[in-house]
Amino acid sequence: MRREERQQHARETTRRAILDAALELFIADGYTQVSIRNIAAKVEYSPGAIYSYFPSKDEIFFALAEEGFHLLSGPDDPGRREYLRSLEPVDRIREMFWHVYEFSREQPQYFALMFVDRYVPRISREYERFAFVRDMKHELIARIQECIDAGDFPSTLDAPVACRMLIMGVLGVAAMQLSDRLGPPEQADVLARDVLNTLLCGLKSGVSLQSRDTLCAVDEAASRATVS
């Protein structure tokens, strides 16, 4: 390995150690209670060394959130894409939202940081960096619109509102399970499945919804940037 490669490898290893330590501290103590000094002490570096990798604690959060949302979106897997295409429209939606719940089980620390801690910075501050998150949301909405166009859902259904309801349903169960407010994990899985199926059945039945579409944080920031 050449000198430049060794240096790059060492830098990547150090950066990873900082992120891992920060994630652990953010989850254990809460974002607002953690300082750069705390992170430095955990990885046995000086605060100045941490700043040479990340200019602020917020930047550490954004790096972790970016990793988390990429984990949620998953790799570009042709096999999974083909599997989703093979499903009926409503089953495709069910599978896509169930994947969000599974993420909470497979990556509980990232999930807690991204969706549970209310004091973390808003990703809308870095809307260009997180544009792919907006694309993920729009993909879900597009799949719901397919169901509307196919007649599986009533034509009066607002796809963005339906998306918001479904995501809140699975995130709610996931957050309760993560905070140990439910029974054993198997019960949480059953509850999450029941919530998802009940919401889908309600949408198919044409139940009257009072909710209205609202822009998510990243959409709102992007809209402001476009206007300016």
Model-derived segments and spans:
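N-terminal intrinsically disordered/low-complexity leader segments
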Residues: 1-13, 207-228
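Helix-turn-helix
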Residues: 13, 17, 21, 25-59, ...
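Conserved hydrophobic residue
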Residues: 31-32, 153-154, 182-183
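Amphipathic alpha-helical packing segments from all-alpha helical-bundle domains
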Residues: 70, 76-77, 124-150, 160-164, ...
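Helical hydrophobic small-molecule/effector-binding pocket
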Residues: 74, 94-116, 134, 138, ...
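Hydrophobic alpha-helical connector segments
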Residues: 78-109, 159, 163-166, 189
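Hydrophobic alpha-helical segments that form the core
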Residues: 101, 157-178, 187-199, 217-221
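Amphipathic alpha-helical segments used for helix-helix packing
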Residues: 105-124, 175-179, 215
